[in-house]
């Protein structure tokens, strides 16, 4: 498939969706390309039920609600959407009147010519960060091992081990502590990389006995047969 567009947006997460809105106000047509099979980026793929508190004018909304609002916002404007497509090459082409355009090709055979490319891919296509010293953690995938939280209800009244020291680990520790039977937060360092406010909330939960904090530890082994039954640190 070959076509031309005013603006090609690589990444259909919140920034990519808002780019369609801003371009629409200028009367420009956008084409969105994303490696995932849905719009919303990490908000939809990794933590659709995660509360977001830092959107101006919106006290609180979930990540999926934020994506849904952006989709609603761009409905008046014309745009094309190509999902499950990974950009593999971007080549400059100089026309006869000395104007540079770009030819973008995807792994599924799309070839798009455009004068403008907006790269809104965030950290890139999502790849799980697996424990480096576990031979095959994915053998328990969906049976005790998960790399994202699609539904908070799946973890209600469960004994949870959360590994990590960034925003996602801290955010989900605070959020799931409301409904989980127990939560153990494990990090290989004593220092955390997440927002200070969320870290303070986590430490309050530790002091009140709602979260068990284990640092500095790494996961050495996942125990179980068909399902996870425990871990070795």
Residue ranges: model-predicted function:
Residues 52, 67, 74, 127, ...:
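A general structural signal for well-ordered alpha-helical segments in protein cores
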Residues 55-82:
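Conserved FAD-binding subdomain of flavin-dependent enzymes
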